[in-house]
Amino acid sequence: LQYIERLDPEREPGRLTFIVRMGADKIRDKLPELVERSPPPATVAWITDPMHGNTYEAAPVHKTRRFDDVLDEVKGFFEVHKSLGTHPGGIHVELTGDDVTECVGGGDEIFVDDLHQRYETACDPRLNRSQSLDLAFLVAEMYRDQ
């Protein structure tokens, strides 16, 4: 928050975008203070990146993420904004339309033991087609309920 004055001294709406990536276990505790200490809500676009704060090593070879943790961080993001009367600006996720096995959980019930089957990422684990659609529908419901 110390950079706000330098980056947006005129408080131009839409100039600043804050992308938070805290992890499902921290979002509800840490985000409220950041939102409350930031400039008026109309000047900042808030986005959550629920992927990076929920990455862990499942085996010596595979980084992964639990779909339920990703979803919980998104839910926490929406809950915090709703409780503060601010607007959740969006989400950033890594995903693919392919049927990869890089993140565990979701409607297809991918387990850690399944990761080796189609672990194709060159960098970070992505949600597969089914997990991406599951998340998209759940986020649409969250926006509807805002």
UniProtKB/Swiss-Prot annotation:
Give, as in the UniProt entry, the pathway in which the protein acts.
Answer: Metabolic intermediate biosynthesis; chorismate biosynthesis; chorismate from D-erythrose 4-phosphate and phosphoenolpyruvate: step 1/7
Presence of keyword Secreted: no
Q: Name one GO molecular function term.
A: 3-deoxy-7-phosphoheptulonate synthase activity
* Enzyme class, UniProt record, top EC level: transferase
**Known EC number:** 2.5.1.54
Q: How does it assemble?
A: Homodimer.
Ordered alphabetically, the record's keywords are: Amino-acid biosynthesis, Aromatic amino acid biosynthesis, Transferase
Q: What is the protein name for this chain?
A: Phospho-2-dehydro-3-deoxyheptonate aldolase
Spell out the family assignment given in the record's similarity comment: Belongs to the class-II DAHP synthase family.
